[in-house]
Structures are given as structure tokens and as C-alpha cells.
Amino acid sequence: MHDKSSSLILRTAELLIFALWIVALVAQSLSAADKIRVGFSAISLANAPVWIAEEKGFFKKYDIETEAIVIGGGATRSLSAVIAGDLQFGSTGGGAVVSAVFSGSDIAMVAAGNNKGIQRLMVKADVATPAALKGKRIGITTLGSSGHLALLLMLRKWNMAPEEVQIIQVGASPVMFISLQKGGIDAAVLQDPTFFMAEDTGFKTLGDPVAMDIQYLQNVLVASRGYVKTHRDLASRFMKGFVEGVAHFKRNKEDSLKILMKKMRIEKGKETYLERSYGLYATQYMEAAPYPSATGTKTVLEFMAKEFPKAKTADPNQFIDNSLIKPLEDSGFIRTLYQ
């Protein structure tokens, strides 16, 4: 009787140890599979959906552990990290994606933080029309930047050639603003919140890509097609958390600002410009179903045709993968977030 009892206890212990071992293996497997690293090229409000989804537990709700990293170094750096496999998702500009695909990468735009532009062309109050810019010095950050593209698109909309103005590389928006104030340049392509500062000191907006309905993929979320294909379930769950982050951002101003102040290290009492920028992102820039714009992609292709001749005939959709967002819209998932 004693031997049978001992044998039963031993057998039970063995089964328990085996069960615990299986649970540990499964937990370890899930933990490894469910980690996602997201990279940003800069500290920006365009990062809000990911930051908010992290802080509010939206990713955790879908069994995902995220690590959001600000890499810096411009749009190409975060894109390179995605291509190398160091990041699963990255935030970058549409032009960088087009260049990468033409260079042989299997990268694709899977969502958009902002299909239009965060820049505005700021001028002195006495500049009444675009024609008054002829021969004037217009400041941009660098040639080939999103601000440069925004300027070229605005000039095209006004039926003006780039040669009709002087395009000058000045540096970041704050530096351009100082140059504008001192008369070093006559106009400047500034981004938020610097164009608010310019408005507050007497300058005015002559060109606004949003008001002019100009799309050029200011900020997009990318992933490799290979990763999306082999990690379909995980990528889909990530996108659920992402669109919940978008919805919370658009619908909950106070809470969103609190999170953004923390992430962007803005001291309390100094959030005036952040709040004004929030208004633009919540109502004009971010969309409930954040599809990358085919129209914006076409625009980018038109301007890259000199560098890549095949851009003239390229299909904009070859740079886009809507397979993560479309099921969420078609199923009504996104709609329920706004009810």
C-alpha cells in the first residue's frame, strides 16, 4: 500500500513538473514571439498612436510587448533598421520608402501617420500673393527634404517653376525662423510648432499643403513584406493597438496631451504650442483608418522620376500594403472605436 502511494505521489510529481515545463516553454515562446520594436526618426506628434497605445495598454491587450525607440538621424535611418530586421516597424517619409523599393528592398508602407504635410510657407504680412515670391529667397531645411518637396508642390500648384525663386538651404525650422526674422531670407518652409511662433510674431501663412489638398506622405509606418507575411497574426494585433492609439488620440485631448508631454519631455505650463499642434493632428493630419495615400505615393513618384526613370510608370500600390488595416475597417473594428 505504501509502495503504491509513493508511486502515485512520484508519478503526480513527475506530471506536475512536466506540465510546468510545458507552460514555461509556451510562455517563453509567446514572450519571444510577441515582442515588437518600433523606431521613430524623430520626436514628433506623428509618433502619438504608438506612445498612447503603450501608455494605455492597448498593445498589452493584444498580448504584445512593444519597445518604442527614437533613433534620430533622419528618415533613412529608421528605414534601414527595418530593412536590417533590427526593427519590426519604423516611422519614415514616403520618399525614403520609394527609394528603398526601387533599390530592391521588400519594404512597404502599412499605415500613415500623416499623408499630407506639417509644413507651411511663412512670409511677411505684406506678401499678398504667390506671384510676389518671384526672385525671393525661400528657406528650406535641406535639398531633398520633405519641406523641399512641399515647397516644390506648392509652387507647382501656383503654376510657378522652382527657377522663379531662390531656394536656400538654411537648417532646422527654429534656425530658419531666426533667419526669417533677421531678413536673411524672405520666406521659409516651417513645420509645427515653429510656424505658430512665426504667426505670433507677425508672419503669415501663404501656403498650407492641407488647405491646398497636397498629399506627399509626410510620415508613414513601414514593415518588410516578409515580416508581415510570416508574422501575420502578430502584425495584425499590432495594427489593432495602433488604430486604437489613433482613436484615443483623436477623441481624448487632455489625456493625450498628458502622455505626449511625458514622452516629449515638455514641462507643465509650456504646452501651448503642443496643444495647438494637437489640434492639427487630431482634426486634419491623422485619419481614423490610417491608410497610406496612393495619391501621395503618385506625387512622390512624379518627383523622383529623374532619379529613378521607372518611377514614371510605377504603380503607387506596389509600395503599399493595406492588408493590416483593411480587415479592421471592413469588419467594423475601427468604426466601433469612435462610437
Predicted regions and their residues:
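Pocket-lining segment of extracytoplasmic ligand-binding domains
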Residues: 174-266
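Bacterial N-terminal signal peptides
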Residues: 13-27
